[in-house]
Amino acid sequence: MADDEEEIIQKVEVKPDEFNGLIGSIAGNLIRDKVGGAGGDILGGLASNFFGGGGGGGGGGGGGGFGGGNGGFGGGSNYDQGGNGNSGDQQKRKRDMAKDLIGGIFDNVVNRKGKKEQDNYGGGGNYGGGGGNQGGGGGGGFNFNDIGGLINSMGGGGGGGQRQGGGGGGFGDILGGIGSLIGGGGGGQYNGGGGNVNPNNLNGGMVNVIGNLIGEAAHRFLGVDPGTGRIIGAVAGNVIMGLGGKDNSLGNIGKVILDNIISGKFRRDVDPFVRPGPDPDRGGGGSGPSPISPRPTTEPQDFYELRDQCLESKRLFEDPQFLANDSSLFFSKRPPKRVEWLRPGEITREPQLITEGHSRFDVIQGELGDCWLLAAAANLTLKDELFYRVVPPDQSFTENYAGIFHFQFWQYGKWVDVVIDDRLPTSNGELLYMHSASNNEFWSALLEKAYAKLFGSYEALKGGTTSEALEDMTGGLTEFIDLKNPPRNLMQMMMRGFEMGSLFGCSIEADPNVWEAKMSNGLVKGHAYSITGCRIVDGPNGQTCILRIRNPWGNEQEWNGPWSDNSREWRSVPDSVKQDMGLKFDHDGEFWMSFDDFMRNFEKMEICNLGPDVMDEVYQMTGVKAAGMVWAANTHDGAWVRNQTAGGCRNYINTFANNPQFRVQLTDSDPDDDDELCTVIFAVLQKYRRNLKQDGLDNVPIGFAVYDAGNNRGRLSKQFFAANKSAMRSAAFINLREMTGRFRVPPGNYVVVPSTFEPNEEAEFMLRVYTNGFIESEEL
């Protein structure tokens, strides 16, 4: 060793049912009237003993959202509706609104004129003429006058095309802009950092400006009626099938994303999901299932093809790959209640996929131990531009309804589209597992079913971390922060995180003797909160950093201390600043508090850092681009194979060098920082383990070590490891899906060695490296 102290690695193993994560351990606290989930925040006890301020040697986190914009569209009103389409009898539409099916539809369903096979599939929408085949239709035909003085006119237009065609006019002379987004500085743990943050206009919440700046006025709609959010020319599947419900209630961002999907202006790079299974060639035959590279066991399912087939044959979809029977529910323990599989239309009269209002924020767990999934789903609803990446808005219980839905998840570096039918497990006519507080809203129950299919069964979802679900729903990289032992310059790190689009959650340790103990200051112990904004304002005692925090309950249970609703501190803030902040004092569960009070009251924080691919896709979907930096990220895949590359941790010096090794070149220090250090996050994720739970395989303890390689460009040897201590490493090896560590180090040439704790433990893994500057990496 470089000094006389031997480097010893620690191992920690926890029971799978304790994998509830920072927010996961108290995620059941989002529930109004039910208690759910197994307890135990595994990192609660580990943070003080091992992490000392963040995974793998300390460090801070990212943050959530673009900053606020200065520019924007002004008032706007007085639009004149254009002529309706020509494909239907106008008077009949007025006499019988039940037959208003978004333009022309099947002739034999509503008795409209035209050719059954062609003309009536398309038709005109509410704002234009049209024509076309299976979803064509005209848009445009309406005029906006004086929308903030920025838009002069919109044209009309016809249209057509197959299934997702669309007509539409255009906007003329769209002026104005989004204004400047915030700048920012650094942060971290290793000898400080941070500083030089421009705090004056820092607004939190990812792309809060999108809803104000895009909406109907700033987007050229081709495939969606901007007034209703309906798909122009869509088939009224609810009339055909008899089990449909109400239209979705989409906000501005949802309408924009839906139109981009329908009109073909934006296409996500998503693969059909194929269920993995053990590979008999790698030990899945006589020696048991293999954790390495499971092979596909099902055929790819194309949502649009399957839906079209069902609509054509007038039948409801039944998924042959995830049957409505016990095989989809469990692999070891049968549910205590008798289960009946029902479609939403058999549960309630008017099912709706997505409703408006607070009900979308109130997700109830049910009787499955997946509170970690509930917390992630509730967090996702706060950001429409992320929510609709997982819950595509091109599906509903009205338009094209055929009992088939799809959801999109991130799986080990790629996005997959999971197709399901809408038969849900119920008991006595009520949903058995996760569901929305509103009894006619079904996105959360269907999302949970798709997630269960992703991993094989509902039982496979028992025990997990919120970070695992957040990553699967965003593709981000998650960190844990112990606020009792915080990293240095945490405030600057949070500001930088908000600028870079990260998501924040926080909590207070639960009182084991009191369920959701309400404190005198209005906060609730053992409850999950989301941090949605950050701002520097002039307070009674000078400039003050305040945080906007949301209670997912969305009710009057709020912080009542300084900077709370209508507190005296707000008297020192100019009205213009309050207006710019969008400040409102409602009993909506959202409140502000000072950073100092936040640190005094909250104990844990979880950060999901969004990579450049996510931020780029948000830009493509919405047209809003972050003015500040985004993370630079590199990803590598590898495997620990028995007697080859599964060398175990540094404790096993004779085999440690056999592990996969990756060279990482960090060349840039953090911008605007004077200490010449760079922020870097390492994350090692083991693949497929949840899929293999039914075969008796669970997570193995994993971790990593990072060495300063100097001028060495090749693999490091046993002799090197014996003589040199690691420059960075995970503080312990834990049987979690992913181990993460944030560090601030000098730029240089480093070698990362991910490993299991014990030698010859097999698993496949993914290594991710995030940094603020240029990064170069390769496997050695």
Curated annotation (Swiss-Prot):
Expressed in muscle and neuronal tissues. Expressed in the ventral and dorsal nerve cord, intestinal and hypodermal tissues. Its main location: cytoplasm. The keyword Ribosomal protein does not apply. The active site is at residues 371, 527, 551. SUPFAM superfamilies: Calpain large subunit, middle domain (domain III) (SSF49758), Cysteine proteinases (SSF54001). One of its GO terms (molecular function) is calcium-dependent cysteine-type endopeptidase activity. InterPro entries: C2_III (IPR033883), Calpain_cysteine_protease (IPR022684), Calpain_domain_III (IPR022682), Calpain_III (IPR022683), Calpain_III_sf (IPR036213), Papain-like_cys_pep_sf (IPR038765), Pept_cys_AS (IPR000169), Peptidase_C2_calpain_cat (IPR001300). Residues 269-282 have a biased composition (Basic and acidic residues). Keywords: Cytoplasm, Hydrolase, Protease, Thiol protease. One of its GO terms (cellular component) is sarcomere. Disruption phenotype: RNAi-mediated knockdown results in adult muscle defects which include irregularities in sarcomeric structures, disorganized integrin attachment complexes, and increased mitochondrial fragmentation. RNAi-mediated knockdown in integrin attachment complex component mutants unc-112 (e669su250) and unc-52 (r367) blocks the protein degradation which normally results from complex disruption. RNAi-mediated knockdown suppresses cell death in the neurodegenerative models deg-3 (u662), gsa-1 (Q227L) and mec-4 (u231). Calcium-regulated non-lysosomal thiol-protease which catalyzes limited proteolysis of substrates. Required for assembly and maintenance of integrin attachment complexes which are essential for maintenance of adult muscle. Proteolytic activity is activated in response to increased intracellular Ca(2+) levels during cell degeneration and promotes necrotic cell death. This is Calpain clp-1. The gene is clp-1.
